[in-house]
């Protein structure tokens, strides 16, 4: 009988979100640095302390923010991308000045925090009230929602994130079945785990014959030989291959339903009180989409970091395309995709409470933004 991809108790112990202390213990145990909200993005000196006064009209709004009122702070968190935000399409808006412009038009300025420990770190920041807006994967976002963190999906930063299984050349893994008897790194609570869950179930692998290591430090573990393979994003797989760490065994291009999304998630109490912020963020996403339609290089440059150069992002886009960088997906696709994630996690015992994705996703912010920009 096929085993579930990860045991219910193990997963829940790893990503319990009852409090920051529990999350910190988890992060220490897996060898990651604590994901307290860190310094602002060093690649973008946005001056993220104190207040900012806007003296020129910004964005498409005629709000009083443009008349010199003091801006309120809006804190964004995302996984750390080599010292930058992992913002996907929203990173284009940030680098082009569009996001700051739209936020200022409704009386806000952004503070941008790259957070260590990927999705679980972002969840901890949300749970602690350290950020109002999170940009991260659907898998950890679903875990947070199921565990009682009150969030609303207000946008999509990337609707198609390709994944891969990467292996060391010396590990003797030449086929999918060769993974049995090996050691595989899987970052629990991340989108990479969602792909791994689907992959193991779809390929009918016997998990009793695979040792799972919960870590985000894939490069080090592959280099030292402490793991034989890792479930990673396709961009990481291409980068690791360029670094001579091994090769990609299989990727998700033949299973688009196994890919994941990068969501824009807001604290529900905050966004209900300040709906104009959700609209402003979606205006920024729509404008950023137009930028890359006219100049695709803007996408590669905005997402590049010290670990992932523009050429690497371009290589991934050549495989996956750029259709995922479409904020309209929050209307047409996201609820359906998220329901698949919720159902898989619940059926595999990875979350204890199921819920309806349609009640979680609020596309009204996008719809209003699109109408305003017509």
Regions found by a protein language model. Name each.
Residues 343-374:
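Conserved C-terminal helix/tail region of periplasmic/extracytoplasmic solute-binding proteins
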Residues 30-54:
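Bacterial lipoprotein signal-peptidase II cleavage site
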Residues 168-183, 273-276:
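Flexible hinge/capping segments at coil-to-helix
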Residues 59, 68, 73-95, 189:
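Extracytoplasmic "Venus flytrap"
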Residues 139, 211, 217-305:
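Pocket-lining segment of extracytoplasmic ligand-binding domains
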Residues 80-84, 273-352:
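Secondary-structure end/capping motifs
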Residues 119-132, 146-148, 177-180, 202, ...:
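Short helices/loops that flank or line small-molecule/ion binding pockets
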Residues 25-29:
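C-terminal motif of bacterial Sec signal peptides marking the signal peptidase cleavage site
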């Amino acid at each position: 009988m096929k085993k579930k991809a990860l045991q219910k108790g193990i997963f829940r112990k790893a990503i319990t979100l009852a409090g920051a202390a529990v999350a910190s213990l988890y992060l220490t145990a897996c060898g990651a640095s604590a994901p307290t909200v860190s310094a602002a993005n060093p690649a973008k000196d946005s001056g993220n302390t104190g207040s900012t006064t806007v003296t020129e009209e910004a964005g498409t709004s005629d709000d009083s923010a443009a008349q010199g009122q003091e801006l309120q702070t809006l804190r964004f968190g995302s996984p750390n991308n080599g010292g930058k935000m992992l913002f996907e399409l929203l990173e284009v808006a940030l680098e082009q000045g569009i996001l700051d412009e739209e936020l200022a038009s409704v009386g806000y300025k952004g503070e941008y925090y790259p957070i260590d420990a990927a999705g679980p770190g972002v969840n901890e920041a949300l749970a602690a009230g350290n950020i109002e807006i999170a940009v991260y994967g659907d898998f950890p976002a679903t875990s947070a929602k199921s565990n009682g963190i009150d969030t609303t999906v207000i946008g999509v930063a990337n609707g198609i994130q390709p994944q891969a299984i990467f292996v060391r050349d010396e590990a003797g893994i030449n086929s999918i079945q060769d993974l049995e008897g090996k050691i595989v790194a899987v970052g629990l609570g991340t989108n990479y785990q969602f792909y791994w869950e689907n992959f193991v179930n779809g390929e009918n692998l016997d998990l009793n014959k695979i040792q799972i290591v919960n870590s985000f430090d894939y490069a080090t573990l592959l280099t030292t030989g402490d793991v034989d393979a890792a479930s990673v994003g396709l961009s990481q797989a291409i980068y690791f291959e360029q670094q001579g760490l091994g090769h990609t065994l299989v990727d998700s291009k033949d299973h688009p339903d196994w890919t994941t999304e990068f969501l824009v998630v807001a604290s529900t109490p905050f966004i209900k009180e300040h709906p104009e912020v959700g609209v402003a963020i979606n205006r920024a996403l729509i404008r950023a989409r137009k930028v890359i339609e006219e100049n695709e290089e803007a996408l590669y440059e905005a997402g590049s970091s010290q670990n992932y150069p523009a050429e690497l992002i371009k290589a991934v886009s050549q495989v996956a395309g750029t259709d995922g960088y479409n904020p309209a997906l929050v209307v047409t696709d996201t609820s359906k995709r998220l329901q698949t994630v919720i159902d898989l996690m619940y059926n595999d015992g990875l979350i204890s409470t199921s819920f309806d994705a349609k009640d979680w996703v609020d596309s009204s912010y996008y719809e209003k933004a699109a109408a305003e920009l017509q």
